[in-house]
A protein has these predicted regions:
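Pocket-lining segment of extracytoplasmic ligand-binding domains
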Residues: 142-228
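Conserved C-terminal helix/tail region of periplasmic/extracytoplasmic solute-binding proteins
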Residues: 266-290
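Short, glycine-/small- and polar/acidic-enriched structural segments
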Residues: 2-130, 137, 156-162, 174-181
């Protein structure tokens, strides 16, 4: 029996993966799916892809493209979420700071270098006209690490998906002082070269099962209640999140949008240059559009 390992963050975006893996659709073909939760985010998943510790990973777009440029040989087999990710801008709940304009220095808690929490600070700096060269970063691994590291007297910012942190904001364990959306589709499905060689077309069949499941979720009236229960979220929050979220439901990739996204990443310093799409996309398994 072959084991196909899939890694993603333990967040509501990945509910389609959790359910498809539970169904084990390829047992009769000698392949068992294994879902691995990685709370430390995209930077850690890029590391796992490089080390062949996972076969697939659901990674933030900007984080994978930066790591690809740095030598990660894995490839994007499709998008998972086509809409932007809305990042909450958080501080210690008892901090006296209530707005970004009150900050004199711009210090960030991040899961790791190259993660979304790191790279989105550059997006925020551009929006707020901060000097990106003067940003400082402390690595804290994940959300629990941020909660432990925060100090009410030290105004450090922590960027994390808005609805994932909402329960802590509601309990006044975190303070959210703003939001910043990613300027591009947020999640890509990435496969290692070894997994593409080992599993072949089955990986694309799995991707298409995810697309089918995601399509059903977006039209199923029970989705709000189901995701709220699975991830301990309020139904009103899930409903708001679903209204601004668009899961990918097919293998199409807009080359215009991708090009504009990479140009923006280059301007921010996330990328040094725009890589050729044929180098990081499995173009033979995708439908490329204008």
């Amino acid at each position: 029996m072959k084991i196909l390992k899939i890694t993603g963050v333990p967040e509501h975006f990945n509910y389609p993966w959790v359910k498809v893996v539970e169904s084990q659709p390829f047992l009769d073909r000698g392949t068992r799916l294994e879902w691995i939760e990685e709370s430390r985010g995209s930077g850690q998943m890029n590391k796992a892809l490089r080390a062949n510790e996972t076969d697939l990973a659901i990674v933030l777009t900007e984080s994978f493209l930066k790591d690809f440029e740095a030598g990660n040989p894995s490839k994007i087999i499709g998008f998972h979420v086509n809409s932007p990710l809305v990042w909450g801008i958080h501080m210690h709940a008892q901090s006296q700071i209530n707005s970004l304009k009150e900050l004199k220095e711009h210090n960030f808690l991040i899961s790791r270098i190259g993660s979304g929490s790191h790279l989105m600070s550059l997006v925020l700096a551009e929006r707020e006209n901060w000097d990106a060269e003067k940003l400082s970063f402390s690595v804290i691994d994940n959300l629990p690490g941020a909660l432990q590291a925060m100090d009410a007297t030290n105004p450090e910012l922590f960027l994390w998906e808005k609805y994932t942190t909402k329960p802590w904001v509601d309990r006044v364990e975190l303070k959210r002082i703003g939001e910043v959306p990613s300027p591009w589709p947020c999640f890509v499905i990435v496969a290692t070269k070894a997994s593409l060689d080992k599993f072949g077309v089955l990986i694309m069949e799995l991707r298409n099962l995810i697309y089918d499941f995601s399509q059903k979720l977006q039209t199923d009236p029970a989705t709000v209640e189901t995701i709220a229960r699975e991830y301990n979220l309020q139904e009103t929050d899930v409903r708001d999140w679903l209204n601004q979220t668009k899961w990918a439901t097919n293998e199409r990739v807009s080359m215009t949008q991708l090009g504009q996204s990479m140009e923006h990443m280059k301007r921010l310093g996330i990328l040094n240059s725009k890589p050729e799409p044929a180098d990081f996309l499995t173009v033979q398994n995708l439908t490329l559009t204008d």
